[in-house]
């Protein structure tokens, strides 16, 4: 999942409408935690922009509880709206033990029980260089996946441009992306690259397919 944009201002709506929309938006983390348990997921990948900007304490409390309730490893790659800078909740808050936040350049963690290596990176400003440039998965684990906030549609985008060639040459099994608010996917080489869109549109300009992806990795 990606692009929750919690605490969005919802400009253009009345005060009553904004209040209702914020309440509905805060239900997203809990709904995804419920889905995770119901589907018996092995891990959760969150590809950035979970916050629209500054996060309220109410939203932080809801998010922490939901992430803990997932009960499995949760790996987060902050994006251009919730980037890791001084004062960021990703750096300043304490997160549940099952949560790993990628706060800098491309790195990886191994989930031994799944024989899986997960690569990720976090934005440190609103702009980010091409994180997959020259990258190739090197781990010996059975599954090689990555979670990034990136733009697969514009090669010159400042929001971590991702090219088809970079996806192909990564030799990942799966690349989970955020940033694009309409769901999409493509295959390049052995790598499936997918972005689920935002789970809740914030205006009439955010229609179309969106939600979350349930992904099964097979040999």
Where are these regions (language model features)?
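N-terminal active-site segment of His-dependent metallophosphoesterases
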Residues: 1-62, 140
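His/Asp/Glu-rich metal-coordinating catalytic cores
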Residues: 43, 53-194, 198-210, 216
């Amino acid at each position: 999942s990606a692009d929750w944009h919690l605490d969005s201002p919802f400009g253009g709506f009345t005060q009553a409408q904004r209040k209702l929309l914020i309440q509905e938006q805060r239900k997203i983390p809990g709904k995804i935690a419920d889905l995770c348990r119901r589907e018996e997921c092995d891990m959760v990948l969150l590809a950035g922009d979970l916050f629209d900007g500054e996060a309220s304490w109410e939203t932080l409390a809801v998010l922490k509880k939901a992430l803990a309730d997932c009960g499995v490893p949760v790996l987060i790659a902050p994006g251009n709206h919730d980037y890791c800078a001084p004062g960021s909740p990703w750096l300043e808050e304490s997160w549940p033990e099952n949560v790993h936040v990628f706060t800098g350049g491309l790195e990886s963690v191994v989930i031994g029980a799944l024989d899986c290596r997960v690569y990720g990176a976090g934005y440190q400003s609103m702009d980010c260089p091409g994180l997959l440039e020259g990258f190739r998965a090197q781990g010996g684990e059975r599954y090689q996946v990555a979670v990034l906030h990136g733009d697969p549609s514009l090669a010159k985008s400042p929001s971590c441009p991702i090219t088809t060639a970079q996806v192909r040459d990564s030799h990942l099994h799966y690349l989970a992306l955020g940033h694009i608010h309409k769901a999409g996917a493509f295959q390049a080489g052995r790598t499936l690259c997918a972005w689920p869109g935002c789970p809740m549109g914030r205006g009439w300009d955010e229609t179309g397919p969106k939600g979350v992806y349930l992904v099964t990795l097979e040999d």
